[in-house]
């Protein structure tokens, strides 16, 4: 572990644990900047928060409310899940952009594509490229180049 008081950056290797607000991130190596509230972890990263969980190969976190994750990313929040090669996500807006093997699961519907944008607060998503969708409970499935999914009002 090393710390530079001028820059506010701490670097660590071996079972690194970083706690930011309600989130705890673990990984093989990483750094955290106390001045910018920016963190980076690499090597089997997991992040657990009060209402979410995520795993990835690498995670870069900004200001306690936004992150980018790469490498077999899996994010779960309530009954909604996101999978992909790369994920950018804002916990404030609950907006996510998933690229590469993108998959979104929400309310019994699975939506896949090369790229999926999701607005989790709204239960709304747009998928592009090699899109598939299915909801076995409603006996519906399909495929397209582009698809939009929104929750039906009650």
Where are these regions (language model features)?
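Structural signature for solvent-exposed beta-strand/loop edge elements and short helix-capping sites
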Residues: 1-154
């Amino acid at each position: 572990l090393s710390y530079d008081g001028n820059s506010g950056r701490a670097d660590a290797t071996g079972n690194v644990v970083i706690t930011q607000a309600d989130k705890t991130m673990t990984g093989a190596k990483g750094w955290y900047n106390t001045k910018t509230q920016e963190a980076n972890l690499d090597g089997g990263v997991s992040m657990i928060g009060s209402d979410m969980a995520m795993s990835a190969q690498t995670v870069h976190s900004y200001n306690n409310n936004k992150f980018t994750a790469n490498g077999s990313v899996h994010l779960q929040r309530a009954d909604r899940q996101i999978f992909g090669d790369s994920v950018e996500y804002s916990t404030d807006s609950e907006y996510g952009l998933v690229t590469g093997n993108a998959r979104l699961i929400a309310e019994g519907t699975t939506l896949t594509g090369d790229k999926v944008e999701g607005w989790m607060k709204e239960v709304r998503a747009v998928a592009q490229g090699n899109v598939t969708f299915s909801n076995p409970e409603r006996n519906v499935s399909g495929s397209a180049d582009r698809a939009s999914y929104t929750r039906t009002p009650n």
